[in-house]
Amino acid sequence: CCIAVQAQTSSKNYLLEKQMLDVSDNQIQSISDKAGSLLYDGSFDFKDGASESTEYFYNANGALTKDLNKGISKIEYDVLDNLSCITFNNGFKTKYVYDAGGSKLKTIHEALTTNTTDYIGDFIFEDGKLSKYQFEGGYCSFDSHLNPTYHYYEKDHLGSIRMVVNENGTIEQVNHYYPFGGVYGDLGYNSELQRNKYIGKEFDHTSGWDWYDHGARMYDAAKGSWD
């Protein structure tokens, strides 16, 4: 199987992806990317980090347990098959905590420092401090004195967030997407402002994880597959 994606800057076209996929029993076993790596700031392309006959490993339920291309040595799940821990080759970890219904309560990123995100209803806390309140059509952020600032989404027909503007109408973020949900690097603006992106889902860019959280499953837009 082959996937080719052509991309464009203001001055020229270039080959973003040319992936050769080895698929067995409807599971991707390995990917070889024939396109060169991109150097554009914030570029979103498949990183071909391995050259093995088997680069993706799965458990009996079909859930991904190891990804050699992303440098992930182990992926663990809880008894309800919720993603619970990702361990990278460098020892960094990302952990998730859920309630009994499977809703995400907490994300923990363990790297050179440890950062936490807590989800309490529509409120989000970063490292124990109130960060934002999410509402339909946008969110409210808070400074250190809990003074609010309102931000509003401009969405496309898929519900993907194309633009974020503040309460004064100032553009704060611009997002453009490839067909499978990858984010343009050079044509976007301030992509780290907030994490909700393609079809409104939260995008986790930490440690090169680069997955969209759809609740029941994670989506990898770089290879267009559910994991």
Task: Walk through the language-model features, giving the residues of each.
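Blade-edge beta-strand/turn elements of extracellular beta-propeller
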Residues: 83-86, 183, 225-227
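Coil-to-beta-strand transition motifs
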Residues: 209, 223-225
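Short, cationic motifs built from Arg/Lys/His that form the positively charged side of catalytic pockets
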Residues: 82, 103-104, 215-217, 225
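Acidic/glycine-rich beta-solenoid
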Residues: 1-151, 168, 187-197
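A motif-centric feature for acidic-aromatic and gly/ser/thr-rich catalytic loops and repeats
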Residues: 131, 143-216
